[in-house]
Amino acid sequence: MKSTDRANAEIQDRLTRTTPPMDVAIAEKLLLEVKEVMDRLGVQFFLRQGTCLGAIRDNAFIPWDDDLDLGVILGVNGFAEQSIEPLLGAFRESGYYVRSGSSDSLIYATLLKDNIRVDMLFHRVIDKQIYHWPGIWFPVTLFNQLKEINFIGETFLVPNPPEEYLRIKYGPDWRTPKRFGYAKDVVDNVPAEHISGFLERTKRSIAGFFYPGNVTRLKVLDNDGSPVDRANIRIVGLGSFKTNKQGYAKLYLKTKGYSSSIASGISDEVGDICSIVVSYGNHEEVLYEEILTPNRSYVYQPDPAQTEGRIFVLSKLDLP
């Protein structure tokens, strides 16, 4: 890796883990620059997630937003998977550092310029749906006829109707600005995973026996550092798991037909970014972004000084 690429990768990783608010003036300049490149190459894209939320609700960037969120539907207007690399090459020529990868449901590219991240997803249509992290499947009808809006003095496209898109993503209270509490709204709005029956438990046992490399272990500790028995660990979009008396839960991350999360893009980590809800007794915490790697062990412990808004807090646990 070139020294400049290594430096950019480190900046991108730091911004991903610490999520500082964007400089709004720079974000506006880059969004217009991205639009110019996409329009020049004839690529139809739309504003998604936080960028769409700010544009529709506030007609402005959300003050604490940390990146630009854009989407492209593969197969629209002749844009296919083989068109992605030439597009990313155009961004490299425009001075962007680009990192890309894929999951079952999408191809992603994270662009970096002037300390601003642009999170660009190229969505595959699967069973007339497209996937949004964490575990949300949208009907493709929301993207068949994108809606034009005026934002920062230009015309942009958003899902249509945008209100329905935002309701599915953020819940019925999407019009209320929330810096931290929105994460619980999002995960609560993801349909519950039907995985508690005997058949599913049997599938997990078989999967763990034949594919032990896919099993991840998570140990849950309470405030005093003691293991928690029967804590519930929900991997949003995938399933729920219980800890044993030693505080450990076995997580089977690859039991569904579609990937439930997207590859991390963190340069020193190979794994999936997941949303996790840890609950026991009167305690519940949403960890909106965590990296889980198959065949690794992690430990969770609450922080009484910060009860919401934590990300990337799971510690790796080295077992004998």
Locate predicted features.
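Active-site nucleotide-donor binding segment shared across nucleotidyl transfer reactions
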Residues: 35-68, 73-77
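A short, Gly/Thr-enriched small/hydrophobic beta-strand-prone motif that recurs across taxa
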Residues: 207-225
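Short, ordered, surface-exposed loop/turn motifs in non-cytosolic proteins
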Residues: 215, 224-237
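Short, conserved charged micro-motifs
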Residues: 77-85
